[in-house]
Amino acid sequence: MAKTSRSVMIAKGLQRVLNVGLLLLAAILIVFLVKETIHLAKVLFVNNEESTSYLLIEGIVIYFLYFEFIALIVKYFESGYHFPLRYFIYIGITAIIRLIIVDHENPIDTLIYSAAILLLVVTLYLANTDRLKRE
């Protein structure tokens, strides 16, 4: 009985530490999200057309990455301390899209990144089927 009680206390203590850590991470991500918003506003008003469009698109994708991580943390607390797999897949797809936008000089690499996105989309489809869906 005492061993079970102690293990429950340890689990609850570790859960609190994890929750506090995630709240701190969410606060840091919100700060970066605000900084990225300011950066996007500055890039929007720069006159150099070609570099501005690349910087703007890259900034928007980074913005979505921050947004998705914050949404993942919110979903963690809403779903009873559980990270849904599909949010990690969304983040992976967005990160690879950002990589393609930033580094698109080698066609073979771009093809491999595209295949990785296709694999993640298939994984997302399978994870959302009724047999695997937890939510």
From Swiss-Prot:
<feature type="transmembrane region" description="Helical">
    <location>
        <begin position="82"/>
        <end position="102"/>
    </location>
</feature>
<protein>
    <recommendedName>
        <fullName>Protein PsiE homolog</fullName>
    </recommendedName>
</protein>
<comment type="similarity">
    <text>Belongs to the PsiE family.</text>
</comment>
<dbReference type="InterPro" id="IPR009315">
    <property type="entry name" value="P_starv_induced_PsiE"/>
</dbReference>
<feature type="transmembrane region" description="Helical">
    <location>
        <begin position="107"/>
        <end position="127"/>
    </location>
</feature>
<keyword id="KW-0997">Cell inner membrane</keyword>
<keyword id="KW-0472">Membrane</keyword>
<feature type="transmembrane region" description="Helical">
    <location>
        <begin position="54"/>
        <end position="74"/>
    </location>
</feature>
<keyword id="KW-0812">Transmembrane</keyword>
<keyword id="KW-1003">Cell membrane</keyword>
<dbReference type="GO" id="GO:0005886">
    <property type="term" value="C:plasma membrane"/>
</dbReference>
<dbReference type="InterPro" id="IPR020948">
    <property type="entry name" value="P_starv_induced_PsiE-like"/>
</dbReference>
<keyword id="KW-1133">Transmembrane helix</keyword>
<dbReference type="Pfam" id="PF06146">
    <property type="entry name" value="PsiE"/>
</dbReference>
<feature type="transmembrane region" description="Helical">
    <location>
        <begin position="20"/>
        <end position="40"/>
    </location>
</feature>
<dbReference type="GO" id="GO:0016036">
    <property type="term" value="P:cellular response to phosphate starvation"/>
</dbReference>
